[in-house]
């Protein structure tokens, strides 16, 4: 008698690329090749095929969830006998440095805004809620940028709380990747969008990740649907090094760049420097603080080589 395979219980439905692609149904492609080029990151070769097979099914799923959420709000308003406030639907996107969170966020912003409902979609990154370099220097945390202790979590939580409370206008600080710092006296104003996409390393973290700064609510408490963009660390490191080399020839050559000195490195020196930064900062942060949040996500997208999505896990 053959022994039965052990049943592995999982809170996720699992799809390979082909299975996920069939869930597109008849959703039309609303992006042109030229628009896609503008949306992709510096180190990513994303194709229209990837948009069709991965992101159109995802935008269809999100549209169902958002419509369901609006119906739930209408039921509550009917019960209370009120008109109610407009409360944005918050989508969180998390994952490692260099995994392509920003491209995923920009793609979803473009696709969701083009559904027939013409919903307004805003995008905010949690980089704006990092402490300024002056504060990080004072606290000896410049080499811990992106780690939990480098964020002004009270301000970030208040921002998301105000968004979900229906505030008519909420402001967020602006971060510059050129100067590697918060831009003084600059704010981005969010005015009750239908959807807010919040992208950052830390959107799935909870209070247990911040023992040094305890508080009762967290960003993840206000996120309606969360996406974790995953990839093996070996790939992440190679993508980071490749991106570093491209920045060395591009953004780092700007005299105003915080990393201007890196533009003078030879290719071998640049590879070694990027590898050291990964080992000492980004890889460490991934293993300690980012990867442990993966299973909190509503959906996990796992990438293989060339940034292509190979599998999707959707929470039941």
Swiss-Prot record:
Binding annotation for ATP: 95-102
Residue ranges the record marks as coiled coil: none
Record localization: Cytoplasm
An example Gene Ontology molecular-function term: pantothenate kinase activity
Source domain of life: Bacteria
Disulfide bridges in this chain: none
Top-rank EC class of the record's enzyme: transferase
InterPro entries in UniProt: P-loop_NTPase, PanK, PRK/URK
GO biological process: coenzyme A biosynthetic process
Major localization listed first in the record, in broad terms: cytoplasm
Pfam families documented for this protein: PRK
Keywords, alphabetical: ATP-binding, Coenzyme A biosynthesis, Cytoplasm, Kinase, Nucleotide-binding, Transferase
Reactions accelerated catalytically: (R)-pantothenate + ATP = (R)-4'-phosphopantothenate + ADP + H(+)
EC number: 2.7.1.33
GO cellular component labels: cytoplasm
Pathway: Cofactor biosynthesis; coenzyme A biosynthesis; CoA from (R)-pantothenate: step 1/5
PANTHER family for this protein: URIDINE KINASE
HAMAP family documented for this protein: Pantothen_kinase_1
Family the UniProt entry places it in: Belongs to the prokaryotic pantothenate kinase family.
Record protein name field: Pantothenate kinase
Organism: Photorhabdus laumondii subsp. laumondii (strain DSM 15139 / CIP 105565 / TT01)
Protein's gene: coaA
